[in-house]
């Protein structure tokens, strides 16, 4: 599961989101969602606080595109890679600026890379 938490939102929910992802996924990839005005690393610290470091596999990658590609490249036949949080959004908000970004486009490109070796 690729998961993050939005910036300038309820910090108390972030560890809960990390814990929920870990309970329901074999591998958790923590990444940026829409950090808005917050430091993306601080947001990931908050989400990671909900993880049990002894349980399961997880990694941390601030760059959402890199995180999505890594999750897809690590997937094996029969795996389901869930890319959570942003859904249909076509932007990522960083430092108050909405930059073009699409989970769907990144995932399609990563799947094409895997398919063509």
Predicted features and spans:
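ATP-dependent carboxylate-amine ligase
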Residues: 1-117
